[in-house]
C-alpha cells in the first residue's frame, strides 16, 4: 500500500475526527493542522496536470469500471462543498487506493493504524468507520467519504457537531450515554498511546467523561440529547476554537 497516498486521506480523517472527538494536544496548532489538511486538496495546485491527464480523470469519473459506480459528479458537487475539480482529484486518489470503489472496515483500520504506531487505533477506527458508513452496509463508498469529509472540512459548526454526536452515539438511538462516551474516550487514549498520557492515571478517560457529562446532561437523566450536546459544545471555548481551525485552513 502506497503510504504517501494513504497519508493524503487518512491524515484528513485523523485531524477532523480528533476535533469532533474533543481531542486536544499542545502541538495541535493552526499551522500543523493546515499543513496536514492541505496534503489532499490543494496538493494538485503544485503539480500542473496535462490536459490529457485531466481528461483521463474525467473519463474515469463518468465511465468507472470499478465494481462500485460513483454517483454523477454533478450530483456529488451539489451534495457537498467541493468543486468539480476537487472531486476529480479526490476520486482519483480514492480509486488508486481502493480500486473496488469502496473501503471495508479492515482496510480502513489498516490505513488508520499507520499514523498511530505508538498506540492501538483499532477501536477508534471502528467507531470512525461507522460514522462514515452512514447506510451501515459495512463499506465506505466514495459518496460516503465525500459527504463526511465535506462536513468535517467545510461544514458549519452545527453540521460538525451533529456529525460528532453521531460518532458518540454508538448504537444510533439518538442519545449519548456515559458508557458510549467512555468507549470513545478509551479508544482515543488507546490510539494516542504514550504520546498523550505518560503520567495520567488509568481512570483518566472516565474522569474526562464525568466532566463532560456534568456540563452536558442538563436535566441529569443520565443521557445526553443532541440539543444538550450542541448547546454545551457551543458554550465551550476550547471546542469552538478547535472547530474554527478548520474554517481557517480550507
From Swiss-Prot:
Q: Which residues form the EF-hand domain?
A: 61-117, 120-155, 156-191, 204-239
Any one Gene Ontology MF annotation carried by this entry is:
potassium channel regulator activity
Sites where the protein binds Ca(2+) 1: 133, 135, 137, 144
Q: Output the Pfam families linked to this UniProt entry.
A: EF-hand_7, EF-hand_8
Q: Where in the cell is it found?
A: Cell membrane; Cytoplasm; Peroxisome
Task: State the residue spans of region: Interaction with KCND2.
Answer: 237-250
- Which segment of the chain is annotated as a signal peptide? none
Residues annotated with Phosphoserine modification: 17, 56
Region spans: KIS: 2-44
The topology of this chain with respect to the membrane is: Peripheral membrane protein
**InterPro entries reported in the protein's UniProt record:** EF-hand-dom_pair (IPR011992), EF_Hand_1_Ca_BS (IPR018247), EF_hand_dom (IPR002048), Recoverin (IPR028846)
This protein's superkingdom?
Eukaryota
Q: Which GO terms describe its cellular component?
A: peroxisome; voltage-gated potassium channel complex
GO BP terms, alphabetized? regulation of potassium ion transmembrane transport; regulation of signal transduction
Keywords attached to this Swiss-Prot or TrEMBL record, sorted alphabetically, are: Calcium, Cell membrane, Cytoplasm, Ion channel, Ion transport, Membrane, Metal-binding, Peroxisome, Phosphoprotein, Potassium, Potassium channel, Potassium transport, Repeat, Transport, Voltage-gated channel
Q: Which residues bind Ca(2+) 3?
A: 217, 219, 221, 228
Query: Where does this protein hold Ca(2+) 2?
Result: 169, 171, 173, 175, 180
Q: Which family does it belong to?
A: Belongs to the recoverin family.
Physiological role: Regulatory subunit of Kv4/D (Shal)-type voltage-gated rapidly inactivating A-type potassium channels. Modulates KCND2 channel density, inactivation kinetics and rate of recovery from inactivation in a calcium-dependent and isoform-specific manner. Modulates KCND3/Kv4.3 currents. Isoform 4 does not increase KCND2 expression at the cell membrane. Isoform 4 retains KCND3 in the endoplasmic reticulum and negatively regulates its expression at the cell membrane.
User: Record's domain comment?
Assistant: The KIS (K-channel inactivation suppressor) domain is required for converting A-type Kv4 current to a slowly inactivating delayed rectifier potassium current.
Q: How does it assemble?
A: Component of heteromultimeric potassium channels. Identified in potassium channel complexes containing KCND1, KCND2, KCND3, KCNIP1, KCNIP2, KCNIP3, KCNIP4, DPP6 and DPP10. Interacts with KCND2. Interacts with KCND3. Interacts with the C-terminus of PSEN2 and probably PSEN1.
Q: What is this protein called?
A: Kv channel-interacting protein 4
Organism field: Bos taurus (Bovine)
**Protein encoded by which gene:** KCNIP4
Amino acid at each position: 500500500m502506497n503510504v504517501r497516498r494513504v497519508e493524503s486521506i487518512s491524515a484528513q480523517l485523523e485531524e477532523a475526527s480528533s476535533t469532533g472527538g474533543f481531542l486536544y494536544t499542545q502541538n495541535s496548532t493552526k499551522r500543523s493542522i493546515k499543513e496536514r489538511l492541505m496534503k489532499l486538496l490543494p496538493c494538485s495546485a503544485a503539480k500542473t496536470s496535462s490536459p490529457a491527464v485531466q481528461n483521463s480523470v474525467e473519463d474515469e469519473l463518468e465511465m468507472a469500471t470499478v465494481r462500485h459506480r460513483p454517483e454523477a459528479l454533478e450530483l456529488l458537487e451539489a451534495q457537498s462543498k467541493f468543486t468539480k475539480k476537487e472531486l476529480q482529484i479526490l476520486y482519483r486518489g480514492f480509486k488508486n487506493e481502493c480500486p473496488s470503489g469502496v473501503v471495508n472496515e479492515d482496510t480502513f483500520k489498516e490505513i488508520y493504524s499507520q499514523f498511530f504506531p505508538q498506540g492501538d487505533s483499532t477501536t477508534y477506527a471502528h467507531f470512525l468507520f461507522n460514522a462514515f458508513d452512514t447506510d451501515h452496509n459495512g463499506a465506505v463508498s466514495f459518496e460516503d467519504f465525500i459527504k463526511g469529509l465535506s462536513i468535517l472540512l467545510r461544514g458549519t459548526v452545527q453540521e460538525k457537531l451533529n456529525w460528532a454526536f453521531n460518532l458518540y452515539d454508538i448504537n444510533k438511538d439518538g442519545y449519548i450515554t456515559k458508557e458510549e462516551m467512555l468507549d470513545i474516550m478509551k479508544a482515543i487514549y488507546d490510539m494516542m498511546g504514550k504520546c498523550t498520557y505518560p503520567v495520567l492515571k488509568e481512570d483518566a478517560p472516565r474522569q474526562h467523561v464525568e466532566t463532560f457529562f456534568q456540563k452536558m446532561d442538563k436535566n441529569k437523566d443520565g443521557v445526553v440529547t443532541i440539543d444538550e450536546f450542541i448547546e454545551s459544545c457551543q458554550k465551550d471555548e476550547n471546542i469552538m476554537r478547535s472547530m474554527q481551525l478548520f474554517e481557517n485552513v480550507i
